[in-house]
Amino acid sequence: MSIGDELVDADEVYRQARWKNQFEVLSKLPRVLQERVDAQKPVIEASGNSATPSNASRALVRHQQNPGDVGLVLNKKFADEQGHESVIERHDKLLNQTPRWHAPWHLTRVIHGHHGWVRCIAMDKVDNEWFATGSNDKTIKIWNLASGKLKVTLKAHDMTVRDLAISNRHPYMFSVSEDKTVKCWDLEKNTAIRNYHGHLSGVHTVDIHPTVDVVVTAGRDSVVKVWDIRTRLPVMTLPGHKGPITKVRCLPVDPQVISSSVDASIRLWDLVAGKSMKVLTHHQRTVRDISVHPSEFSFASACTNDIRSWLLPKGELLTNFVSQDLDVINTVSINQDDVLFAGSDNGSLTFFDYKSGHKYQTFKTKEAPGSPESERGILSSTFDGTGLRLLTGETDRTIKIWKQDETASQDTHPNLPWNPKLDSQRL
């Protein structure tokens, strides 16, 4: 077969990839195809950050499934004019890597007080002394982190409190609810001082812009709203999603807003232009949560049995985590120590090394005494300001606090085995 014939095959692979909506933009091909297009079709590795099918320096690799062997068999490989590694060389290097060891996590405290599911948790990361929770019981409760004792209960919503956001620059907290309202709370007076009206249905998510005095909300009406905190006016409405929006996150630079939705997409928004600058369509089901890395310019997203990380600002796929057995993933959180936590509907707590994608610990939570086993789902999570404590809100109406075992070592507590796959790990 001539090189020209191989390039025709390459064009066909990318035509199929586009048809299957694996990539939104194909004017610049990705450096490595992260997912197999078809088990019986080749995967292209292109040299450099961008390539076109006219470049001759590429490798054709065929994924073959043999009994007991999931491997990569090199069918054809052209010389790489740039001296880049082949797919096989990259895979071998990945196999030889040793992922970072992390100490295992264990339960240290169970906090009772809510009379409904704990839907959301927000941490005060300025002083790192208290946190707030919202529940199906329509209340917001503020707790002392060190003692676990209740400080105050806030009542103003008429329905479930779905999300909370605490300002790092002002003594304000924002809450959103199924009652269609957005409320601003004065934390010095513990009272609601502003209401923001404009959503047509339940509001599911809220976040505060880190540098501009605006708050961003979204929910069942499928639009993202940007509000001026002081005037209470919606300065911008961003349509685009085809279903209810599950989460919004704000960043100080573009994309200044990231949103996820029931329509299985993630949108990166340009607030200056007032439109989405990129749409990520790799997930196949409802994207239930997104979490921004505290120090790396990237974020993670989660849907049922699927966790992925993305490089910002353009939204390139970084890692497809091995998460096919995690059931419905409701929440993900990342700390500054590169630990990614995922909490599932079935009560599973799963911990990954964020950089390598290594799943190093997984176990089930324990429901509160008197609660049925079905009430052990994990709905919300956050790390404290140090990243050393993990807080989870659960369906048994409790908040649980988890810590790493300070006495553990790599010899006494080895992590789960490292079994990387070329099509799922960051290269």
From Swiss-Prot:
Entry keyword Zinc: no
Keywords: Cytoplasm, mRNA processing, mRNA splicing, Nucleus, Repeat, Spliceosome, WD repeat
Transmembrane segments: none
Chain spans, region Disordered: 404-427
Example of a GO cellular component annotation carried by this entry: precatalytic spliceosome
Source organism, top-level taxon: Eukaryota
SUPFAM superfamilies reported in the protein's UniProt record: WD40 repeat-like
Main localization category: cytoplasm
Location of the protein in the cell: Cytoplasm; Nucleus
PROSITE patterns listed in its UniProt record: WD_REPEATS_1, WD_REPEATS_2, WD_REPEATS_REGION
One Pfam assignment: WD40
Xref: InterPro entries: G-protein_beta_WD-40_rep (IPR020472), Prp46/PLRG1-like (IPR045241), WD40/YVTN_repeat-like_dom_sf (IPR015943), WD40_repeat_CS (IPR019775), WD40_repeat_dom_sf (IPR036322), WD40_rpt (IPR001680)
GO biological process: mRNA cis splicing, via spliceosome
WD repeats: 113-153, 156-195, 198-237, 240-281, 283-322, 324-362, 373-412
SMART domains: WD40 (SM00320)
Matches recorded under PANTHER family: PLEIOTROPIC REGULATOR 1 (PTHR19923:SF0), WD40 REPEAT PROTEINPRL1/PRL2-RELATED (PTHR19923)
Quaternary structure note: Associated with the spliceosome.
Chain's role: Involved in pre-mRNA splicing and required for cell cycle progression at G2/M.
Protein family according to the UniProt entry: Belongs to the WD repeat PRL1/PRL2 family.
Name the record gives this protein: Pre-mRNA-splicing factor PRP46
Gene: PRP46
